[in-house]
Swiss-Prot record:
PROSITE patterns: RIBOSOMAL_S15. This is Small ribosomal subunit protein uS15. Keywords: Ribonucleoprotein, Ribosomal protein, RNA-binding, rRNA-binding. It comes from Onion yellows phytoplasma (strain OY-M). GO terms for biological process: translation. It comes from the Bacteria. SMART domains: Ribosomal_S15. Part of the 30S ribosomal subunit. Forms a bridge to the 50S subunit in the 70S ribosome, contacting the 23S rRNA. GO terms for cellular component: cytosolic small ribosomal subunit.
Length: 74
């Protein structure tokens, strides 16, 4: 259910500012978005998986905070 190493590397490659940039807000938001998409698909098939639903809410909250931070910085 989690992103594979190759998927994460591809996301980092597409959204990084420079080589090996894993900590920038853009990269973190992109990774969270991919994880949220996977969790949403999982929850469509398993609607009573409350542990995953909580994880989805936490990831959404973290992404929202990062987007707000990025908007304030730029």
């Amino acid at each position: 259910m989690a992103l594979t190493k190759e998927q994460k590397q591809e996301i980092i490659k597409q959204n990084s500012r420079f080589a090996k940039d894993t900590g920038s807000s853009e990269v973190q938001i992109a990774i969270l978005s991919a994880e949220i998409k996977q969790l949403s698909e999982h929850l469509k098939q398993h609607p009573h998986d409350f542990h995953s639903k909580r994880g989805l809410f936490m990831k959404n909250s973290k992404r929202r905070d990062l987007v707000k931070y990025l908007a304030n910085q730029n």
